[in-house]
Amino acid sequence: NLKGVDLTSASLGFKIINTRGFNSTSPVRSLQLIDGVDNQAPGLNFSLGNFLGASELDIKRVELIVGASSGIYGPNAFNGVIDMETKSPFDFKGVSVQTRVGERNLKEVMLRVADGIEDENGRGIAFKVNLAYLTADDWEADNYEPTEQSQAGILNAGGYDAINVYGDENISDGANNFSGDYGQRNFPGLGIYHRSGYKESDLVDYNTENLKFSSALHYKFNKKVEAIYAFNFGTGTTVYQGDNRYSLKDIRFQQHRFEIRQKDKFFIRAYRTSEDAGGSYDAVFTALLLQDSSQSNSSWSNNYNTYWILQVRPKVWNLPGFPNPQVNPSVWFGDSKDSTYGVANNVYATFSDSINSWHSEARSYADSLANKPGNLPYFIPGTAKFDSAFAHITTQNTFQQGGSRFYDKSSLSHFQAEYKFEPSFMDILVGGSYRVYNPSSQGTIFSDTGGVVISNYEYGGYLNLKRKFLDEKLILTATARVDKNQNFDYVTSPA
């Protein structure tokens, strides 16, 4: 338990660390580094955690810096930094294997192989290879309580807006709400009703998989200076929680890094990160498009209340004790209106089983009726028609084209250098970085349709001064950083 640190589980394969009370599944203001390399997805713009990170067997150290760290690490480190360092093949040689099993059919196996040679002058070469694979049955989102926005409760005969059911939200312009004066008089017992939606479990692949591969080649020029080429690759399927629920399916992520460094003195680092969203899609939009593929919300709503008028309303009027407006319409107006509503509501409560049954009939009628050209009945999960419509929607790129898949083959290229001067009176650290983003989403994330090519760059520099006093018992530091993004003014970060 660390003060000010929260661990959020968006899914079994997705653990997100938050600091400073910003508990989010998209910690865009927290910086995650692995051997100095930013672990963010270039297009999705959030760190994918260790789902596409380093193998557990290869982790040497994890440092969590809570609080604003923009002075050294840049403006993205507003909430803090998670800095992971992997093991050097010069220091950690041999073969390591680890496996574990657990609940929800979890199986994980990891392998690390490392070796190297080094002469008496420190010159040498070493390599390491890591492989990790995880598979499990992810937690299913099965909370069917009403959302905060739902106008109806769980006992409402016409349904309600459930948390993990999508497509059952309120229809625009209140077209599903007949609880007002007009509805009470002309649609007795109809009240509020919600369209038949789709459970998340019918839309999302809960079979979590994660494959990670990394390799590195280290060359030492002497005992101090070494060059490194590293390659990291990750792929898998999991669920991500953002504004909507997303199925990250067969997402792929790779990094190439080249670095020359002398520990605690200098480094020159360049890396490139590329991603491919694979077959990932938005589960909520998928539900909405499945509904729209059968019939529009307005058509479904009209079918529902038409059935109520023609088939149910006469039955409601004839319920014992109901104030039938055909017999005495005046009681529904004026001073007697409120008492009449009270009598009607008591009748609804007395004959609630009948009201529930009639709503089920109206729902079945609206779900099955295709009264316009091109309309189809509700796609029942598990049927061939559902599978066909689902496959079509999740393989089309944009919502406008009838698809919920998001295309993302974005990349970023980063160059960074740092040098430490050590005069007798203080330590002086200077550094700078330059980054270029190359988004590619075919309009599913960015406005890059019609052949539009987007590119964005940013750069920054920093200076850190450190002075020690009283036999190094007192240390004073001062940091200043300046950053510039192509689309924004200069930003300074003193500390």
Please give the residue ranges for each predicted region.
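Short strand-turn segments of transmembrane beta-barrel domains in outer membranes
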Residues: 69-71, 81, 86-118, 131-133, ...
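Outer-envelope beta-barrel architecture signal
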Residues: 28-30, 91-95, 107, 121-127, ...
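Outer-membrane beta-barrel domain signature, strongest for Gram-negative TonB-dependent receptors
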Residues: 154-428, 432-435
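Extracytoplasmic beta-strand/coil segments of soluble accessory domains associated
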Residues: 2-38, 60-61
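Short sequence motifs at beta-strands and strand-loop junctions characteristic
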Residues: 9-11, 74, 102-105, 203-210, ...
